[in-house]
Amino acid sequence: MDRGSLLPFQLWCPRPFGTYSQNQPRPPSAALKPSACPEPGGGAEPDHGPAHSENTPPALATEVPASQPAPLLSAAAAGDEGRVLLDTWYVIKPGNTKEKVAFFVAHQCGGGSRASSMKVKGHWGSDSSKAKRRRRCLDPTKAPPDPGGREGPPAAEEGPASAGEDVDLLSVAEMVALVEQRAALALQSYPRPTTPAPVVFVSAEQGGPAKGVGSERRSGGGDCSRVAEAVAHFEAQRDSPPTKGLRKEERPGPGPGEVRIAFRISNGREPRAPDSGLPSGGGGRPGCAYPGSPGPGARAKDKITCDLYQLISPSRDALPSNVEFLLARADEASEGDSPAPARPEDTPPAPPPPPARDCGASGFHVDVVVTGVVDECIFFGKDGTKNVKEETVCLTVSPEEPPPPGQLFFLQNRGPDGPPEPPPADSPATAPGPDDAEGTADTSLCRLYRHVSHDFLEIRFKIQRLLEPRQYMLLLPEHVLVKIFSFLPTRALAALKCTCHHFKGIIEAFGVRATDSRWSRDPLYRDDPCKQCRKRYEKGDVSLCRWHPKPYHHDLPYGRSYWMCCRRADRETPGCRLGLHDNNWVLPCNGPGGGRAGREEGR
């Protein structure tokens, strides 16, 4: 089939079951585009003449000539280019003759301003899916799309009057680009606080604060980004530190109740503030404990910093009243002239920025999220100094707010006058002086720990004393312990044997028997090694032991006895499984095998 002999008119089909809608001719200003797909039948079927049937549209008085004639098409098809494109679409039945002629119809949704992205789906799923996957035919008059994938069709650029015109069938990439560009144009003309999900706007500067939705964006076709660019922007926002311009709900911070601590080990090229201990190049981060000038025998390039740059309380709404950053100085030299820390009631508690990433080639940055209790974190450096600072994080709650679970004893009691004062620094927090004989003058100690209440310490001490075994029981003589153990049941003795090795040795050495024990105290049973029963025996069952080779009967002074396991009622008890019950040696008169035993003895 020659492609040059195909007709360029628009395809049309009626609605199912022969229902027509009103025919809407295209205005003369619209550009008539070539057909989306050629007819496999060679265009012989549309040339039926004036005969109107159910599948033929009624003739119209006005015909629109083609504004863009195809150069490769035949000249005889110029009179058929003025066909009217109906706003109807037809579900192709399998086996219909129109399936060979029409595959798709550009459907206009009643003069709306957006292009229809509806899939042409049929009610009969046998052959209609084949037509939906047809590729677009070759059109030499249409320019190929640019590498960016953004193509401005004439219907979207002519103005609001022609913005809702029919759009020819496009490929998947072209349709995605068209939808993205139309959404971007609509968002530029009508700024709204909510941005649709498929459109992602990337701010022009990555280092500065992120822009809002209604703020100035990049002009031109670069407004809507591709999928890869959006994914890269999302990953960059997730990996990058939080900026000051973000709101609190947009800030990528930890969850409620988490403490995020950033540690940075960098080289010594950054200058240090002499008195406050805060770096001058990092934007004044509070809570950074910088050691002092390096000693003669220490490395001058390494210093360890500890930044507590975000602390989110369990209640984010009452953040100023729930979170306090209290800094306690431990050194005696700077105790008098150090200024008091600002309370969150006076200034809004904006979290300090994270440490900068320009740490040099030898530095690295680690983010540690701590959700549990931080008792004490000790970091040893190589710089000898006395300026060691404690950073204490105190969580306080209002009296009407219930305490968070798991932190009942970690919350300080809030008095009626105001928040509690920071506890005084203890002696272990002081740095070792230069006059130490151990030579630890060049080791600086930076501690970050959380103070706990005195009630918690008392309760923890009482619980530990209750849980630990009594130490004075080890001082008792053995005969007293044996007498005490003889009054205990089976489960208590088993628990003592599993708890303390000393008690286990006494119980096994002296043969302590439980009060509910079924071991035979007869000395004749002392030679029986079988102490465990694992097999399920019936009452009166006589069989060999599973672990010890011994006869199933025993000749005793009072007659031949047979070994059997525990009774069925006692077999499920833990004592039987632990081997603390006795093995029953029953006489022939007690078991069903007594007659057989008597016959064996008579032989």
Curated annotation (Swiss-Prot):
Regions of compositional bias (Pro residues) in chain numbering: 347-356, 417-426
Modification Phosphoserine, positions: 21, 67, 338
Record annotation: effect of changing residue 216 to A: Does not affect interaction with FBXO31
GO cellular component: SCF ubiquitin ligase complex
UniProt-annotated stretches for the region Disordered: 20-63, 111-163, 235-301, 326-360, 396-440
Keywords on record: Phosphoprotein, Ubl conjugation, Ubl conjugation pathway
Role of this protein: Substrate-recognition component of the SCF(FBXO46) protein ligase complex, which mediates the ubiquitination and degradation of target proteins. In absence of stress, the SCF(FBXO46) complex catalyzes ubiquitination and degradation of MTOR-phosphorylated FBXO31.
Protein name per Swiss-Prot or TrEMBL: F-box only protein 46
Species lineage: Eukaryota, Metazoa, Chordata, Craniata, Vertebrata
